[in-house]
Amino acid sequence: MNIGRLVWNEDDKAIVASLLGKRALDYLLSNSVSNANLLMTLGSDENLQNKLSDLVERPNASNFSWNYAIFWQISRSKAGDLVLCWGDGYCREPKEGEKSEIVRILSMGREEETHQTMRKRVLQKLHDLFGGSEEENCALGLDRVTDTEMFLLSSMYFSFPRGEGGPGKCFASAKPVWLSDVVNSGSDYCVRSFLAKSAGIQTVVLVPTDLGVVELGSTSCLPESEDSILSIRSLFTSSLPPVRAVALPVTVAEKIDDNRTKIFGKDLHNSGFLQHHQHHQQQQQQPPQQQQHRQFREKLTVRKMDDRAPKRLDAYPNNGNRFMFSNPGTNNNTLLSPTWVQPENYTRPINVKEVPSTDEFKFLPLQQSSQRLLPPAQMQIDFSAASSRASENNSDGEGGGEWADAVGADESGNNRPRKRGRRPANGRAEALNHVEAERQRREKLNQRFYALRSVVPNISKMDKASLLGDAVSYINELHAKLKVMEAERERLGYSSNPPISLDSDINVQTSGEDVTVRINCPLESHPASRIFHAFEESKVEVINSNLEVSQDTVLHTFVVKSEELTKEKLISALSREQTNSVQSRTSSGR
C-alpha cells in the first residue's frame, strides 16, 4: 500500500501539484524509491561537494557559473535494481540580469507570503512522506524559500530507476543530454520539468559518469558546448575502472537467536547482507593477494542500532545563502550506505564463500586496512557561500578493528536510533567560525529587510534591490516634505522680517441677541494686505468684502469695480503678488 495515499488528502495533493506539477506528484506517490529500499551505493567520491560547489561558485574563463549542480548517485535497491538517488547538491540565487522576463512576470503576479506558506507546507509533506522526524525537517529552519532553493529541496526526494526521468534516461543511454530554452519549450525532459520552469531554469545539462549522473542548470539560455561536457565528465570521472559484481552468499554454521535485529524492516539474515569475517588462521593460509582482497572484511563489523547511535566523525559547517545537501552514505569511501547493525547474541564468525556473478557491478575495495570505516553522514543543509569542509577523524587505535571501537559511545547521551530524513546542520554544538558568523550576519540582514519592508509604502517588487530603491525614493520624498515644513515654520514663527505693530481698535456692540464685533487694524498687519495691494496696482476699487469661515477653510469675498479691469488681468495681478510673497518668505528663511 502506498504511504503517500495514506498521508495526503486531496487538498494536500492539489497544493503539491500546483508547485511541483501533476507528473511529479504522481511519480512521487507511485514510482519514487525511498531511502529505506536503497541498501548500498556503488562507489563514492570524497571530493564530491567541492566539485559541485566549484561549478556553482567559481566562474570559468567566460565568467560563467551554473545556478545549481546535482549529483545523482548510483545505488542498488533491495530488489537488486540500479537506481539513481540523491547524492549531493549545491545552488545559488540568480545574479542581477540572469532571471528571464517570464519568471519576473510570474513572480509579480503572486502573493509572496501565501506562496512561501505553500512552499513550506509542500516541503513538510515531502519530509513526512519519506519518514523524517520534526527535528530533522530543514523547512522549519527557513524563513524564506526562493525559486532555486525550492527546486533543489524538492529534488532531494526524487529517485530514478534506469530509463526513468531525465537522469534515468541519461544513465541508460550513457550519453550526455543538453537542453536549451527549457522554459519556452513544450517538451518535458523530466518529471521535474514543471518545477524547473517555475524556477526559471533555461538550460539543463545531464552528463553520465562512472558513479552516477551530474545534472547542471542555469537561468541563462546556453548553446550546446562539447568542451563544457568534456570538462564536466573529466571532473567527475573516477580513477577506478568499472568492474563486474561479485555475489557473496552466506553460509551460517550455527544457530542464531530468533529475535533477530532488522534494518528498515527486513531481516539481515534473510536478506543476504550479513556481516562476515575470515578467521585469522584461514587468512594466514591464503596467498598475499587474496589476503589484501579480504582486508576490508576484517574491519567490516556491525553493531546493534538500538544500543547506541554511531558518533558523527565528519561534519560540514553551516553556510549563508548557498545550499549544499549530502545524502546518507555518499561522503565515505564505502559501498554500504545505510547503518549496519549486529544481533545481540552474535559472537561467532561466519564463513563466506565468494562465487562469480553476472551482475553488472561489483563491490569496490574500501580504504586501506589501517583506516577505520566511517559511519554514513546524515543529510544536511548548509547556508553559506563558502564550501569549507570539516576534517574527518581517521585516527586508529591499537587492536581496534571494529566499527564499534572506532565510533565509541554517543557523547550527547542520545541512545535512540538515528532516523532517516533531511536535518539541517545548524543545531550542532561547535565553535563559532567564519562560516557560522557569515550565516548569522545574513540572518540579521534578512531581518533588517523585513523591517524595512514593513515601513516602506508602495513597494513595486518583492526583491531586495527593488525594496532598496523604493526606500531611497521614500526617504527623498520625506526629505522634500521636511524642507517645506521647515520653510513654513520659519514663515510663521521665526521670520526675520521686523515685527509689525498690531495696534487694533476692537469695538463690540450688542443689539438684542446679536453681538457685533468690529476690528480696525492697519492694512500692513492684516493677512489680506497683499491682496489689497494687488487691487491698488490694478486700479481696482473694493466696494465690499465679506469673510466667512467653514471648518478649516476661510472664504474671503471681494466686490470690486473697475472700468478697464478684465478677469485675466485680475488673476494675473493676484498670482504675481502671491509669487512675490513666496519668494520673500524663501529669502527670509535663508
From Swiss-Prot:
Record field: transmembrane: none
Expression induction: By UV treatment.
SUPFAM superfamilies given in the database record: HLH, helix-loop-helix DNA-binding domain
InterPro entries, A to Z: AIB/MYC-like, bHLH_dom, HLH_DNA-bd_sf, MYC/MYB_N
Gene Ontology CC entries for this record: cytoplasm; nucleus
Coiled-coil regions listed in the entry: none
Swiss-Prot/TrEMBL GO biological process terms: negative regulation of gene expression; regulation of DNA-templated transcription
Pfam family, one: bHLH-MYC_N
CDD domains to which the protein is assigned, alphabetical: bHLH_AtAIB_like (cd11449)
Limits of the bHLH domain: 429-478
Annotated Basic residues bias: 416-425
Highest taxon above the source species: Eukaryota
GO molecular function list: DNA-binding transcription factor activity; protein dimerization activity; transcription cis-regulatory region binding
Location of the protein in the cell: Nucleus
Record flagged with keyword rRNA-binding: no
Residue ranges of the region described as Disordered: 274-296, 385-439
Main localization category: nucleus
Keyword line: DNA-binding, Nucleus, Transcription, Transcription regulation
Keyword DNA-binding on entry: yes
Complexes and interactors: Homodimer.
Protein's UniProt name: Transcription factor bHLH13
The species this protein was found in: Arabidopsis thaliana (Mouse-ear cress)
Organism lineage: Eukaryota, Viridiplantae, Streptophyta, Embryophyta, Tracheophyta
Gene encoding the protein: BHLH13
